[in-house]
């Protein structure tokens, strides 16, 4: 397996784009893999393709649309009203059950066929919005499972696991891509590029993080 190459699970959003450039700094060769999972806003994949082109990394897309049909969630179901806050005692309906499990499992198979053992994902337990598949315990467990399942030595890297959105913006700035991430990524649950709609949960988290980082930077 090639220890100088990494595969980034890449959506074209703030977190995965930060991880893409983090991977470029830490590995000699980087691949980016995006997924069509039945999301309402498939524009994100085209933006991901363009960002990967600018980053000069190899880009691929896998169609896993069946994931969106397995359970109800507001990111794939056009009839569902999006939760604006995390409901008490349950995950928000923006949670796509099994998404990170499927993405990382498929990414591992994709990586294995190319001799890659480093996988990079932008999950964060600090700002995980209540999603169970963004927790460190899940990632560590899946890492062990993938290695046992394929008799390989995969390493799942989570550069954002223990940092909040303000610190994620700080990392983007350190990597020299703050403006690119602010203007060219798509994090908004309503499918609006850049600063987004400004009021969905993803935009709120992103905006508050940026404001906190810029305030600290300008002190």
Swiss-Prot record:
Belongs to the QueC family. It is an enzyme of class 6 (ligase). GO terms for molecular function: ATP binding; ligase activity, forming carbon-nitrogen bonds; zinc ion binding. It catalyses: 7-carboxy-7-deazaguanine + NH4(+) + ATP = 7-cyano-7-deazaguanine + ADP + phosphate + H2O + H(+). Its cofactor is Zn(2+). Its EC number is 6.3.4.20. SUPFAM superfamilies: Adenine nucleotide alpha hydrolases-like. Zn(2+) binds at residues 188, 197, 200, 203. Pathway: Purine metabolism; 7-cyano-7-deazaguanine biosynthesis. The keyword ATP-binding applies. Keywords: ATP-binding, Ligase, Metal-binding, Nucleotide-binding, Queuosine biosynthesis, Zinc. Catalyzes the ATP-dependent conversion of 7-carboxy-7-deazaguanine (CDG) to 7-cyano-7-deazaguanine (preQ(0)). The keyword Ligase applies. ATP binds at residues 10-20. This is 7-cyano-7-deazaguanine synthase. The gene is queC.
């Amino acid at each position: 397996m090639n220890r100088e190459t990494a595969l980034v699970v890449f959506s074209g959003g703030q977190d995965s784009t930060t991880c893409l450039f983090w991977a470029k700094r830490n590995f000699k060769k980087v691949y980016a893999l995006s997924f069509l999972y039945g999301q309402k806003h498939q524009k994100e994949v085209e933006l991901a393709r363009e960002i990967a082109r600018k980053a000069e990394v190899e880009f691929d897309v896998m169609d896993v649309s069946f994931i969106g049909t397995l359970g109800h969630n507001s990111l794939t179901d056009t009839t569902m009203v999006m939760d604006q806050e995390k409901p008490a005692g349950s995950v928000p309906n923006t949670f796509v059950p099994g998404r990170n499990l499927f993405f990382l499992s498929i990414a591992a198979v994709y990586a294995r066929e190319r001799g890659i053992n480093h996988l990079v994902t932008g999950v964060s337990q600090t700002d995980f919005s209540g999603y169970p598949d963004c927790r460190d315990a899940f990632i560590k467990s899946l890492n062990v499972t993938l290695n046992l399942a394929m008799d390989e030595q995969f390493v799942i890297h989570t550069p954002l696991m223990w940092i909040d959105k303000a610190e994620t913006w700080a990392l983007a700035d350190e990597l020299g891509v703050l403006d690119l991430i602010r203007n060219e990524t798509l994090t908004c649950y309503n499918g609006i590029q850049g600063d987004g709609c400004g009021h969905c949960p993803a935009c709120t988290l992103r905006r508050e993080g940026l404001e906190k980082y810029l305030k600290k930077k300008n002190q």
